[in-house]
Structures are given as C-alpha cells and as structure tokens.
From Swiss-Prot:
Residues at which substrate binds: S11, D14, S38, K41, G67, S69
The entry's keywords: Lyase, Purine biosynthesis
Primary role: Catalyzes the reversible conversion of 5-aminoimidazole ribonucleotide (AIR) and CO(2) to 4-carboxy-5-aminoimidazole ribonucleotide (CAIR). Does not accept N5-carboxyaminoimidazole ribonucleotide (N5-CAIR) as a substrate.
Catalytic activity entry: 5-amino-1-(5-phospho-D-ribosyl)imidazole-4-carboxylate + H(+) = 5-amino-1-(5-phospho-beta-D-ribosyl)imidazole + CO2
Family annotation (SUPFAM superfamilies): N5-CAIR mutase (phosphoribosylaminoimidazole carboxylase, PurE)
Name listed for the protein in its UniProt record: Phosphoribosylaminoimidazole carboxylase
Natural source organism: Treponema denticola (strain ATCC 35405 / DSM 14222 / CIP 103919 / JCM 8153 / KCTC 15104)
Superkingdom assignment: Bacteria
Stored Pfam families: AIRC
A GO term, aspect molecular function: phosphoribosylaminoimidazole carboxylase activity
Enzyme Commission number(s): 4.1.1.21
Pathway per the UniProt entry: Purine metabolism; IMP biosynthesis via de novo pathway; 5-amino-1-(5-phospho-D-ribosyl)imidazole-4-carboxylate from 5-amino-1-(5-phospho-D-ribosyl)imidazole (carboxylase route): step 1/1
Family label: Belongs to the AIR carboxylase family. Class II subfamily.
GO-annotated biological processes: 'de novo' IMP biosynthetic process
Length: 159
C-alpha cells in the first residue's frame, strides 16, 4: 500500500503553506490529504481525524502547520504512532518569536521541525524511501539533480 502524508493545518489561513508542501509531495509521487483542525479550538475534531487516519493500514506520517502558539505539532505527535513533521508558517510578528512554540516540546514528544515547505516534503519522502523503492528512486533522482545543478553553476564560474 502506498504511503500517505496528512497535512494538518491549524486554520485555513495556512492553505498557501500547505499547497507548497503538497506540490513538492507530488514530485515524489506521494499521496496526501489536507485537513484543518486546531489543538486549541477543536481538539475533539483533531482527535477524531487522527483516529480515522491511524486506523488506516498503510504507511503514513503527519506534517503539521500551525503558527502563533503551535500546540498542534506536539498534540499530533503525542497521539500518533508514526512521525510528525512540524512546518510552521513564517511570521514577522514579534520578531519571529512564534517559532519558539515549535522548538520546545515535553519529554517523549518529538516532532521534527522543518521550516521550509519543500524540505518538509523532502523529509517525508526520505522517511518513506526507507521501505518504498519508487520513492527512494525519486529521492535519489532529486538529490542527483540538485547536485548536478551546483556542479554546472560552478563550471560556469571556472571559465
């Protein structure tokens, strides 16, 4: 069964960030679902969603998008069996202090923190590549392409 990434946003204002992640997941051939739920405002709704996804017999992980006070990432990570990747949206408010709510988690709660949407999708792909050859091949091709671009850019400077 093909892996699934559940992109869980704290609110609809995070849709642009979610779409960037989804676009990158497509390049790796990874199926995804985009959902909305707030750990602060709709905790029961989030639990219901997580139970639904956890019942699926397929590889899955969660990418959470929540700004301001990011309780969502820790909440999800504490509930699910697999990996959670926190990818909070950028914020200029309060000199970017929102990020601190994604950095410190209680013991036993360990969402990975990745700030760039493309890199959050790449981490998901790399996790799934451990047991999915198609995704592993996509990741390898992606990494080789990035490396080749650097080499080409360097060769232009050597002239």
């Amino acid at each position: 069964m093909r892996p699934l990434v559940i992109i869980l946003m704290g609110s609809s204002s995070d849709m642009g960030h979610a779409e960037k992640i989804a676009s990158e997941l497509k390049t790796f051939g990874i199926e995804y679902a985009i959902r909305i739920g707030s750990a602060h405002k709709t905790a029961e709704h989030v639990v219901s969603m997580l139970k639904e996804y956890e019942a699926l017999d397929r590889p899955k992980l969660y990418i959470t998008i929540a700004g301001r006070s990011n309780a969502l990432s820790g909440f999800v990570d504490g509930f699910v069996k697999g990996a959670t990747i926190a990818c909070p949206p950028p914020s200029d408010s309060f000199a970017g202090a929102d990020i601190y709510s994604s950095l410190r988690m209680p013991s036993g709660i360990s969402p990975a923190l990745v700030l760039e949407p493309k890199n959050a999708a790449l981490l998901a792909a790399r996790i799934f590549s451990l047991y999915d050859k198609e995704i592993a091949d996509s990741v390898k091709s992606y990494m080789e392409s990035n490396a080749q671009k650097i080499i080409e850019d360097d060769s232009k400077l050597k002239r």
